[in-house]
Amino acid sequence: MSFVRVNRYGPRGGGRKTLKVKKKTSVKQEWDNTVTDLTVHRATPEDLIRRHEIHKSKNRALVHWELQEKALKRRWKKQKPEISNLEKRRLSIMKEILSDQYQLQDVLEKSDHLMATAKGLFVDFPRRRTGFPNVTMAPESSQSPTVVSKDPVTQAIRSESVIEPQALNEVDDDEQEGTVNSQSEESENELDNSLSSQSNANAGTFLHQIKEENSELINKLWTDIQQKVATQSQMTASSGTPSSASPSGEQKAALNATNAVKRIHTRLQPEESTETLDSSYVVGQVLNSRKQKQLLNKVKRKPDSRAPSKQKSSMLSASTASTDLPSSSNPSLDVLKHMIHEVEHEIEEYERWTGREVQGLQNSQGLTGFTLSLVSSLCRLVRYLKESELQLRKEVETRQRLEEALGDHRELIDALTAEVLFLREENTATQARLQQYMITTDEQLISLTHAIKNCPVISNKESQALERGATSQRHIDNPEDPAVNASVSMPLMFRGEDVVEFPQEDLPVKLSQVPNPPESGDLASSLPGHIFEPAVLLTPPRQKSNSEFSPLQDVLRRTVQTRPAPRIPPTVEIIEKEQNWEKKTLPVGADIQNSSDESHLFTQRWRASHMGEDSQSKTQAPFVSLSQPLCSSQSSMQQSRNPTLSEEPLVLGDGQQLRTNETLIQRKDIMARIAELTLQNSDIRAHLNNIIGPGGEQGDGLREFNRQETSHASDTMATFPAVQPLTPSSMEERIAELNRQSMEARGKLLQLIEQQKLLGLNPSSPPVSPVQSPLRAWAEGGKRTIEVSIPGAEAPESSKCSTDSPTSGLNSRRSSGAASNSCSPLNATSGSGRLTPLNPRAKIEKQNEEGWFALSTHVS
């Protein structure tokens, strides 16, 4: 394969030209968007901008700057004519001179640094004097202006004498007199400003050529420069340094015979001394060594080729300004010592403030002591800085731990706050439920009160009570009337007009929430009519548990019962609990207290008389006891008025909790008991009328008893006994009193037995014995007891009553202690007495069946 490129078509114009075949232009078809839509792949404006930025050239700014420079150069070439050869030579000479001066200045600065460092190591730093370097110039040549430097530190003492070059190289030629004068002026300027450099040989040659070509221009320039330098040297003459010791005046006159040299020496002589160089100048050179270099670099960067005279004058002015810097801004050694003392004093204050050990000031002499104190101060400062940094780190760690603890405490506080809010919400809900319960209870109490008030039967019973009171009054006024009021057996709860009403549905936990007695209505008008009608007791009374009895009742029962009994009727405890509850709900008064004491005493006496009652047989006289039905009806009425007392276990005044099951069973038997007991009450009234009816003076005794009983019952109907707290001493006194009353009751019963024996053995005598035990009233602290003697009835009527009602004996014995308000001589207030008429035909059976206190045991 050949790499030679050959013209395929041959030379132009030769041969046959080939015809160009025109391509057929194909018709552009329209884009079919139905196949694929490529607009989704089109770049967004942001993508286009990013791509442009990516593909831009990195050197764009540099190229732009270069292009601008080229354009500026073109304009400058067009505007400015070409520089002459003289200007080019002048610029080259100045560059050479200035470069040499700059290099020399750098070398001097480095040596100054080295000397200052060595001076700090040795206490006796070298003593140096000012030298005047003099350069012998070649004939017919002038020295170029150099940068003035006032630093004479590194200049060695070259000679003991000051020899001017003009004294050694004097020329008698008058033509060169101006040149010598100019050279002498230059040497004067050099002495004034302590010049320390010399020009190169090349510079001299160039200047000689320039002088030959342009002597007039150079002479004019140098005259201007000399005038400026002379004025500046006069201003800085006072700051000149002493020179070395000069030889004798004769030698001076011989060597320096020129007028310029004499004038300079006469000016410098008063200032000459043998003192050493000021150390502050040295320290200033060490501390401010770079200032002169910076100023010279600035001068170096400002070349001006358009005006050589301006260039030279600006260079000289910059050099003189640089020479003025050490004298004006350099601190002395004393100032530095004072400053380091201030630093040490501040460090001491800091040490006292922070509680550190204070270190004394160090007496520094010379630069060595200054350096030592400076280094020690720096070490102390660095140590304190390190300690403060460690303390700061510890504080940061402590702060982090405290922040963590604070976060934990905040979480705990938030949790406790949430718990408190939750408890507050629960408390609010509980209070709302309690308020709702109280409102519901109040509504139920109000509704129950209205229901009891609106019951029409109580008003009928009230009228019956009024009629009963009238009948008893009629018996008192008519002592010969044998009739006995048999309608005095209304239960205790329904005898008064001011009776406390108790709710049916909910009994409040606190007894103080029960409505007040003045708001209660007449209970006698709110009971159904069949309550006091004759009834038959179908079920015997249930034995209550001992937990339902109060502790006082248990003590009294154990004290009074001198013999064990097979069964104690529970209705007595029910009556006492009712009376105690009524006492807690009603206010305390003097009459109420008396009634309460009597009720307690007679209830216990009734118990003493009922210990052996269950052992009596059915063949006994049917009128064994009249108190059971009435008291049973009374307790049944009390239970019927509180049917919902034990829907919830409630705590009463004595702290006992009623049992729910027992109360539910009581609720079911309430109505049946009421009917049965009312029937028994009617039967007992009929039997009482039949027994007492035939006797004449019997009626007197019973009327008297009925009158006293009715009057006493009217007292108890008005108000109910209140609660009286019993102390152990009062309980013992009460027990002793009960025992005494029991003994008195035995005596009275013996008298009644004697009367019954007389009636049974002497049927021809009057039916009622004229011997009658008087009514006895005793008072102890406002208490009273009415005791009467009631003669028994004849045997035929007793047998008749027993045949008419064969179950009346059993029923009356079962319901003993329920209706004692009407005819009990032992307790006319609480309803717990017993009447046992004599039946001679059943004497033997009664002796076998009755208990320890049966009346038949006393019959002979």
UniProtKB/Swiss-Prot annotation:
Annotated GO biological processes are:
cell division; metaphase chromosome alignment; mitotic spindle assembly; regulation of centriole replication
Naming one, the record's GO cellular component terms include: cytoplasm
* Region feature (Disordered): 160-200, 232-254, 293-330, 790-860
Q: Which residues carry this modification: Phosphothreonine?
A: 236
- At the top level, the lineage of the source is Eukaryota
Q: Where in the cell is it found?
A: Cytoplasm, Cytoskeleton, Microtubule organizing center, Centrosome, Centriole; Cytoplasm, Cytoskeleton, Spindle
Keyword match Nucleus: no
Where along the chain is composition biased (Polar residues)? 308-330
State the coiled-coil residue ranges. 383-437, 729-755
Give the main localization category: cytoplasm
The modified positions for Phosphoserine read 646, 765, 769, 824
Q: Which InterPro entries match?
A: SPICE1
Instruction: Give the compositionally biased regions (Low complexity).
Output: 236-249, 808-824
Q: Tell me how this protein assembles.
A: Interacts with CEP120.
Q: What is this protein called?
A: Spindle and centriole-associated protein 1
